[in-house]
C-alpha cells in the first residue's frame, strides 16, 4: 500500500512492584507506532497488537518498527489509511522491553496497562484504544480489559486466553505441554546475550516450571497464586466498560473453543457489548484460505472449505473499529442472542 504513515519507536516507563524482582521498580515497555497522514491537529484512535513476538531473537523476528507479516501489514495497508494509528507492543521480557518473560503475570499485565494509557494520552490520539491479536497476542487484550482503563474502548481477541491454566486443564485432564509451557516454550524469550539478561531472573520465571509440574500432577494450585494471578475473565467482568469482538476457530486444537463459549454468554450477562465470529477453522485468522486448508483435514473442518473463509473480515474490522473508536459506543443491547454452552 501507499506509504501514508511513519513508524517510530518509543519506550514507556512505569513502576513495577519491587516484589516482582528482575528490573523492578523500573519497568520499560518497547513499542512502535504508525500514525496516518492526516491534517495537522487531527487526532486519531489507535489499534494495537501486544505480544512476545516483535523484535525477538528467540523467534528471529525483525525489529518492532517493521509490521508483523501475520497481522500488522494487513492493518497498515487496509485500515490505517482510513484514519487510524497502529501500534505494536512487546510484552515484558521480550523484544526491547525489559524485566522478564513472566508468562502473562502481574508484571506483564502492568506493562500492558501502562502502554494502553500511553497510547491513549498522546497529543495525536483521540483517546480511544482498540486491541487485537491472535493466540498469545489475543490474550493480552483480556489482560488490558481487567484494569477498566478509560482509554481501552474495544478488544478483538482471536483464539486468546481468558486464563493460562484454563488453556491446558479442562474437564479433568491435563495437556502434555502444560508442565513446560512457561520456561519450556517461552523460557528463552528476552535472553539475547546482553547485560539486561539478568533481569529475566524474576520470581515467576523461577516458580513457573515447578507450578506447572505441580498442577500437572495434582490438577490444582498446590501453593501460591500463580494461576489465580493469570486468570483474567473475572476481573474483566468486574471492571471492563468497553466492547468485545470475540473470534474463535471451532476446530482450533491449540486454543480450544471453550475459551470463547460460554465466555461470550458471561459477557452478555455482565452487560458487556459483545459480538462473536466463530467458524470451522483451526488456529487461524478468519480470512486465510491457504492456512485454513493446510491445517484442516477430513473430519476436522475441511468439509466446510472454502465456505468458512471470511474474505470480508478486514472490511468487518474496519466497520467495527470505526463504530467503536470514532463514535460513542452504541447502547448495550440486552437482547443479544445467546450461544449454547460448551460441554
PLM feature spans:
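N-terminal cap/lid segment of alpha/beta-hydrolase-fold proteins
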Residues: 1-39
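Conserved small/polar residues in nucleotide/adenosyl-binding loops
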Residues: 326-333
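Alpha/beta-hydrolase fold nucleophile elbow
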Residues: 124-135
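Cap/lid segment of the alpha/beta-hydrolase catalytic domain
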Residues: 48-114, 118-120, 291-298
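Short beta-strand/loop motif that positions the catalytic acidic residue
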Residues: 246-248
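Accessory cap/linker subdomain of secreted extracellular hydrolases
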Residues: 27, 56, 69-75, 81, ...
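Conserved alpha/beta-hydrolase "acid-adjacent" motif
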Residues: 254-259
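Glycine-rich nucleophile elbow surrounding the catalytic serine of serine-hydrolase chemistry
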Residues: 134-143
